[in-house]
From Swiss-Prot:
Ranges of the Hemolysin-type calcium-binding repeats in the UniProt entry: 342-359, 360-377
GO molecular function, one term: zinc ion binding
pH dependence: Optimum pH is 9.0.
Protein name as it appears in the record: Serralysin
Lineage: Bacteria, Pseudomonadati, Pseudomonadota, Gammaproteobacteria, Enterobacterales
Residues annotated as catalytic: 185
Amino acid sequence: MERYMSLKKKISYSELIGSAKANELQTQLQAYVPGKDPNIVVEHEPSKNAAKELIRGDYRWGHQGDDKSETFQLTYSFLESEPDNMPWHITGFSAFNEEQRTAAKLSIQSWTDVANINFTETTDSDKAHITFGFFDASLTGSYAFAYLPSPESKQSGTWYNLKSRTFSENDIGVNGYGRQTFTHEIGHTLGLEHPAAYNASDKERPTYKKSATYFEDSRAYTVMSYFGEKNTRTDFKGIYSSAPLLNDISAIQEVYGANNTTRTDDTVYGFNSNTDRDFFTAKDENSKLLFTAWDAGGNDTFDFSGFTQDQRINLNEASFSDVGGLKGNVSIARGVTIENAIGGSGNDILIGNDAENILKGGAGDDIIYGGLGADQLWGGEGKDTFVYLSAKESPPLERDWIHDFVSGEDKIDVSLFDLGEAGKGGVKFVREFTGAVGEAVLRYDTVNKVNDFAINLGDKFSYDDFWVKIVGEPILESDFILA
């Protein structure tokens, strides 16, 4: 196993030799990755099985061999009176009011969005798989609790302390701690455990330092954790996730299968959202987003255009983005492709994935990096920098197109361009290719008003070389930052 740096020792990068913008991008590509991000203090080693730790006890409805292609059917009910089997250590039953029922249903929906399960409400609480109720006194000091299921289970209850202000109207809304608590306890009823063997009833209060057994045990990765997101470098500024996060989604799909019917059309997250989910929706510049995107198909967009802060938007699966003034508050579930991103009016960094991305920086001095795939790139207003790290990111048959480039303001940066062993001399402009590695040619099509920028990796120019199209007026060699 790869070893990580010891407690409270920061991890440094290898020395970067590119431009300031290229180095900033390179740093962002490694953000939130323990062992690579120098801002992370590693108190526990990362786990390659972090998601599976949530289902280590094999608690579930149904059996291990059940067909995950078939949707698992469950029922739930809100208790209207004290049940005969009310847990021994609590007293003072109360039923959920309408606002609390609505919030709990939204938490249920957030689980069915990602897993191949279906919940149906029933008024027959005796036969419901999962029940909801309040209490107002506990011999053990309970705040909220739920029962884990088993293949032979007939019912699992969730209970919440009504004396806690957490379950008032304000705190059960989106990003509230009460709403997260509903999502957390429902996670237990579906079979998810805490990331490690700790509980609120422990004699000694659990802490990240003493109780976590691996790095990812924080609320940045899972709603099942007791520990704040700052333990793993992210910062949500006091809000809480209303829906399953990165490792929750992987874990619940391992048990019941994935819901592959969720958001199969072209979906927009953030501003102009069509998700019909409050936690995916931004209404104005003061909105706070916190989510992991699970999306089963379509051509999808992260639209963070209404924010004014400097943002870091990464479209790669299992990555974290800094959106709307928070840190690491938006992530993408494993196996999910989000194709497009729109930045705001700050100085943003937009990072594409292997798909054919559309990236729009918006106002501000942005850094745009398409990665692999034939991308369409817009910098928007401001002094923007388009960074390339290798020829694979824009080969002749999958060329990127850069739009709205302004000569003298915007830059194309190849200062960290990988030319291999034969290209130690870097990238240099020439009139015509001679076959030498690193030769660059700039041409302008006066009819179509398109610039062509190409780099030769050796011998004749071929499919393995680099070629990008820049739309607009003629650009100059001085508009490039070379390796």
